[in-house]
UniProtKB/Swiss-Prot annotation:
Family as reported in the entry's similarity comment: Belongs to the ECM1 family.
Predominant location category: nucleus
Keyword Cell cycle found: no
Protein name: Shuttling pre-60S factor C23B6.02c
Spans annotated as Disordered: 1-25, 47-111
Keyword line: Cytoplasm, Nucleus, Ribosome biogenesis, Transport
Organism: Schizosaccharomyces pombe (strain 972 / ATCC 24843)
Compositional bias segments (type: Basic and acidic residues): 83-111
Composition bias type Basic residues, residue spans: 1-12, 59-73
Subunit structure: Associates with the pre-60S ribosomal particle and the nucleopore complex.
Matches recorded under Pfam families: Alb1 (PF09135)
């Protein structure tokens, strides 16, 4: 889906003499440029506005926000895994201690 242009950017392009259709210099410039040059210029403008080809149309601010939220989720998941590991270790230790105590009690009871 195409991104809706803001009024501010539209007004900026309208005030630019290169985009001004009423200006005679803009018409002269258009006649001098070939179709390939016009297309290349428009593609360059779009790429500049979108933040480059590597961003795939996602604005830099939005991309950074997604990355930070993803990093936060990863950190939270890692912390939860570590906590679960710790709990399992604690239960193993407590079970082994209980088993040792039972064995000691049996040995004392036998003697």
């Amino acid at each position: 889906m195409a991104k809706k242009q803001s009024i501010r950017s539209r007004n900026f392009r309208r005030s630019d003499p290169a985009y001004d259709l009423d200006s005679s210099t803009a018409i002269e410039n258009e006649t001098k440029l070939s179709v390939k040059e016009k297309v290349a210029k428009e593609i360059a403008n779009i790429a500049l506005r979108s933040g480059g080809s590597e961003s795939n149309g996602i604005s830099k601010k939005k991309k950074n926000k997604k990355q930070t939220s993803k990093k936060a989720k990863d950190k939270l998941a890692a912390a939860l895994k570590a906590q679960a590991r710790e709990e399992r270790l604690d239960t193993k230790i407590s079970k082994s201690l209980q088993k040792q105590e039972k064995l000691k009690a049996r040995k004392q009871g036998d003697e």
